[in-house]
């Protein structure tokens, strides 16, 4: 993992900027985007035409993913969806790739797992929901292992995996942030893994700036709301964000879209200094040791990577709750109760 402000971080930042416009670099990369698009289309076609068969794991599957590169708010969406499905009478489990973890075989994730062995998002989901969570690059194998260990699970939520066509799914939810499809180009000329026209059952858009929705069918607003911050060393100690308004505050985030976290804090009335760390930043050491701030606000996803050896009394964790549209929940429940995996 690159250091904060290192070459990889600068490259990521430049690509993110370039992917929002159709500049010279984007046009120069379009031949490679055409090749990427052809390969992706062949994979989709292989499953759509029956040349390859998706694997039915015996229970309905809801995939929460995206067609763009980078963070869009999938993890809080998965957490909220698990809670909503449980409230509707289901017993959900979660599968994930376990990005960043050294996982080769299906592995159970518990609240006591380490982020390095489980992945930061799966660990956060396990801690927030209490649902069974299994990780493996082969999501079919993860789902099969989860069902064998938890036969009472009657629906599986896949954290990401929209392009993992081998896993049969009943519902596909695609999450966007305010950037939507950027410049509209496929990788590497743009941020798209698949065309914006790709079929899905519903689209969720998290736009903390305008709140506007694109004119796409079955599109719902996704609201991410911060809760009271809790102290990293003393989780029972909580403070409303408003209490940080008159302190010297640094907001730091090692997530796919750190600016979204910063915007959330600004919307809560704070004016923090900000530091964007590389996505999945490992926190091998304390990058804040030389910073003169009264408080440092970090994300839950970053907090799961900070073990007991961290002793920085300035660190506060800001939880984020996703509010799902009741109509979206009703749509998902209806599809789960009325259709088998396909």
From Swiss-Prot:
Q: Fetch the Pfam families from UniProt.
A: LpxK
One Gene Ontology cellular component annotation?
Answer: plasma membrane
Reaction(s) the record says it catalyses: a lipid A disaccharide + ATP = a lipid IVA + ADP + H(+)
Record carries keyword Kinase: yes
Q: Any idea which positions bind ATP? A: 68-75
MF terms (GO), sorted A to Z: ATP binding; tetraacyldisaccharide 4'-kinase activity
Q: Which InterPro entries does this entry report, sorted A to Z? A: LpxK, P-loop_NTPase
Its Enzyme Commission number(s) read 2.7.1.130
| GO terms under biological process | lipid A biosynthetic process; lipopolysaccharide core region biosynthetic process
Q: In which pathway does it act?
A: Glycolipid biosynthesis; lipid IV(A) biosynthesis; lipid IV(A) from (3R)-3-hydroxytetradecanoyl-[acyl-carrier-protein] and UDP-N-acetyl-alpha-D-glucosamine: step 6/6
The record's keywords, sorted A to Z, are: ATP-binding, Kinase, Lipid A biosynthesis, Lipid biosynthesis, Lipid metabolism, Nucleotide-binding, Transferase
The similarity comment for this entry is:
Belongs to the LpxK family.
**The protein's role, per its UniProt record:** Transfers the gamma-phosphate of ATP to the 4'-position of a tetraacyldisaccharide 1-phosphate intermediate (termed DS-1-P) to form tetraacyldisaccharide 1,4'-bis-phosphate (lipid IVA).
User: What name is this protein filed under?
Assistant: Tetraacyldisaccharide 4'-kinase
This chain's source organism reads Burkholderia orbicola (strain MC0-3)
Task: Give the gene that encodes this protein.
Answer: lpxK
């Amino acid at each position: 993992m690159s250091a904060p402000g290192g070459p990889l971080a600068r490259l990521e930042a430049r690509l993110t900027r370039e992917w929002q416009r159709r500049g010279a670099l984007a046009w120069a990369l379009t031949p490679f985007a055409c090749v990427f698009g052809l390969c992706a289309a062949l994979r989709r076609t292989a499953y759509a035409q029956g040349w390859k068969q998706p694997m039915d794991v015996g229970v309905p599957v809801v995939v929460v993913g995206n067609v763009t590169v980078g963070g869009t708010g999938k993890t809080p969406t998965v957490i909220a969806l698990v809670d909503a499905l449980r409230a509707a009478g289901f017993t959900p489990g979660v599968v994930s790739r376990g990005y960043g973890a050294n996982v080769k075989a299906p592995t159970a994730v518990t609240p006591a797992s380490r982020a390095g062995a489980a992945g930061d998002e799966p660990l956060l989901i396990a801690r927030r929901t209490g649902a069974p969570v299994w990780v493996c690059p082969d999501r079919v194998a993860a789902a099969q292992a989860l069902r064998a260990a938890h036969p009472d699970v009657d629906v599986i939520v896949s954290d990401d995996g929209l392009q993992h066509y081998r896993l049969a799914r009943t519902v596909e939810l695609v999450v966007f942030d305010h950037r939507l499809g950027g410049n509209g180009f496929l990788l590497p000329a743009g941020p798209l893994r698949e065309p914006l026209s790709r079929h899905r059952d519903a689209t969720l858009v998290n736009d903390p700036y305008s709140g506007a929705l694109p004119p796409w069918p079955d599109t719902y607003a996704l609201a991410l709301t911060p809760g009271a911050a809790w102290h990293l060393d003393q989780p029972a100690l909580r403070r409303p964000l408003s209490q940080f308004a008159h302190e010297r505050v640094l907001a730091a985030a090692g997530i796919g879209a750190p600016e979204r976290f910063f915007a959330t804090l600004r919307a809560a009335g704070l004016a923090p200094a900000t530091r964007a760390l590389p996505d999945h930043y490992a926190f091998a050491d304390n990058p804040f040791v030389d910073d003169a701030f009264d408080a440092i606000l970090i994300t839950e996803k970053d907090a799961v990577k900070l073990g007991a050896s961290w002793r920085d009394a300035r660190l506060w964790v800001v939880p984020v709750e996703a509010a799902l549209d009741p109509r979206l929940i009703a749509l998902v429940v209806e599809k789960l109760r009325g259709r088998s995996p396909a």
